[in-house]
């Protein structure tokens, strides 16, 4: 029996009402169908986008950092792919046995690992980055759900501590933190790429969406450094520091013709990829960041200024008797009474009195102008972090005693690198040339500070100073003529100078007629009773110069072994 034919129902329910209910239900199905069609056909891009927002991820494709090479193409720093581990906390299998083993393998305390996995609101958390391959294999074999592996890059430094202060290091994000790694971070780092993907709730990539942008690897960088010279210089410096129980030391070797830095070594040093217990003493690139009063290594510059201004000649006589001299109430002394010396003799014997009397023939401005021309008091123009300017006060503030002490290296400060750089004006026939950390085959062209003739005269004086009758005969080396100046400077303590703490210097060049290299050595606080630059720093200079010239295939210019003496004339300081 039909609904409309039932007498009971027909009397109680109007026909139009039942039809209305059926119509509403039918209309509902029509609306739902239309909406479904709209979503799937007309406006599907909006909902696809919403889905992507919830499950799409942009994966970074890491760029491989460029290599750092020495001048001969040997690797100083390179990147190797290494695995890193991350997790989706809410998905991690909490098996206590597996987590304990994971903690052991990754070297993470169990409490710390547990804390990392507690925040289940996070969809990504690093567990351990840059893990050794054998460890990564064992972690993978644990098969812990919710823990995943990603490829990253880690730097390797084959030369270790010998080149650490040159190369520097990167952090876990592969960003340069020190040295060349920091200076050229942008060029070495390249540009990472990206990949847009859809991931399921387990973090697995199920689909690529959009175009992949490939990474652009960093470019390789070739330095001027010769890794063999660098290693040898570091070894000899380390030996000297340990022998004399010194606090620290530095060596700088420059190519006198191109201005290239061939070696820059410091001790103490550090291993760049093992920095767990790194101290500030190890990290400091002392050759560039530490400034000192250079002592007698400034005397050749004082004499060169006087020669250039026509106030003296190499044979001008200077009376240094009786080995002391008073300037405005302050007494300047020599270690001996040298009597009357030629200007050459002032350098050879390292007379403070002689240097003072020569400086009195000059104006403060003449000295200051030349100091500025040689880079003193200015930050070195070299692409390297931490290089400092040193200190030279404006000449208008100089008192007579200050002008006097500056003539032999007190009252101003410079880094070892600045001292080596200033001597390019002697080695390069009077031109102060730019220096560079990058390889170049071009002979440098610089700013003329001294005439060729005066530069040659200074080189002759430096050869005398490094000879048997000078203060630095231990700088002499087999097969090559050398010239240089030793320096011994008392260290400042408070407002005065220590009577027991010294810095020993030696700065020079070889071969002397046409120098190919400049070498500067500084040893800080030798404490075994020997502290003169001619005894502590000069032997390091000798060994480094001889080995470097051999490595450069420079022909010896001495036919016989030089007369290397075992005693040194005491220098004034």
Regions inferred by a protein language model and the residue ranges of each:
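Periplasmic/cell-envelope proteins involved in peptidoglycan metabolism and beta-lactam response
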Residues: 1-275, 365-375, 386, 494-495, ...
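Beta-lactam-recognizing serine transpeptidase/beta-lactamase-like catalytic domain environment
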Residues: 2-6, 77, 199-210, 251-296, ...
């Amino acid at each position: 029996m039909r609904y409309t034919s039932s007498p009971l129902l027909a009397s109680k329910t109007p026909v139009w009402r039942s039809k209305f209910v059926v119509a509403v239900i039918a209309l509902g199905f029509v609306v739902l169908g239309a909406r479904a069609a709209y979503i799937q056909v007309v406006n599907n891009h909006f909902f696809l986008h919403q889905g992507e927002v919830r499950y799409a991820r942009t994966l970074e494709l890491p760029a491989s950092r460029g290599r750092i090479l020495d001048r001969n193409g040997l690797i100083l720093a390179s990147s190797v792919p290494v695995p890193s581990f991350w997790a989706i906390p809410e998905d991690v299998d909490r098996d206590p046995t597996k987590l304990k083993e994971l903690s052991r393998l990754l070297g993470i305390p169990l409490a710390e690992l547990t804390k990392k996995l507690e925040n289940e609101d996070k969809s990504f958390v690093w567990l351990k980055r840059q893990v050794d391959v054998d460890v990564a294999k064992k972690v993978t074999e644990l098969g812990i759900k919710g823990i995943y592996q990603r490829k990253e890059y880690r730097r390797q430094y084959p030369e270790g501590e010998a080149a650490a202060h040159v190369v520097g290091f990167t952090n876990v994000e592969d960003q340069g933190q020190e040295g060349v790694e920091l200076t050229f971070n942008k060029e070495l780092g390249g540009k990472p790429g990206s990949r847009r993907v859809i991931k399921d709730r387990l973090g697995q990539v199920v689909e690529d969406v959009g175009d992949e942008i490939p990474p652009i690897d960093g470019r390789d960088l070739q330095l001027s450094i010769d890794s063999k010279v660098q290693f040898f210089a570091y070894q000899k410096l380390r030996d000297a520091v340990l022998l004399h129980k010194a606090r620290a030391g530095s060596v700088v070797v420059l190519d006198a013709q191109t201005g290239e830095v061939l070696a820059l070594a410091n001790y103490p040093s550090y291993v760049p990829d093992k920095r767990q217990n790194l101290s500030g003493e190890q990290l400091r690139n002392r050759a560039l960041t530490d400034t000192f009063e250079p002592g007698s290594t400034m005397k050749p510059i004082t004499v060169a200024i006087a020669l250039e201004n026509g106030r003296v000649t190499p044979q001008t006589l200077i009376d240094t008797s009786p080995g002391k001299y008073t300037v405005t109430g302050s007494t300047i002394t020599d270690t001996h009474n040298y009597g009357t010396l030629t200007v050459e003799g002032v350098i050879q014997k390292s007379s403070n009195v002689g240097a003072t009397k020569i400086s009195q023939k000059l104006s403060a401005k003449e000295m200051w102008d030349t100091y500025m021309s040689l880079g003193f008091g200015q930050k070195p123009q070299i692409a390297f972090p931490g290089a400092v300017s040193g200190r030279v006060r404006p000449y208008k503030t100089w008192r007579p005693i200050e002008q006097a002490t500056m003539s032999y290296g007190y009252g101003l400060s410079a880094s070892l690198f600045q001292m080596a750089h200033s001597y390019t004006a002697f080695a390069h026939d009077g031109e102060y040339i730019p220096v560079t950390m990058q390889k170049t085959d071009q002979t440098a062209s610089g700013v003329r500070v001294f005439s060729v003739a005066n530069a040659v005269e200074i080189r002759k004086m430096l050869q005398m100073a490094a000879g048997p009758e000078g203060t630095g005969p231990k700088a002499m080396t087999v097969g090559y003529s050398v010239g240089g100046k030793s320096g011994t400077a008392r260290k400042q303590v408070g407002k005065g100078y220590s009577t027991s703490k010294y810095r020993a210097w030696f700065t020079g060049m070889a071969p002397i007629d046409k120098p190919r290299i400049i070498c500067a050595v500084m040893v800080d606080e030798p404490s075994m009773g020997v502290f003169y630059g001619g005894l502590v720093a000069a032997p390091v200079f000798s060994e480094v110069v001889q080995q470097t010239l051999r490595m450069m295939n420079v022909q010896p210019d001495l036919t016989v072994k030089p007369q290397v003496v075992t005693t040194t004339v005491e220098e004034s300081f």
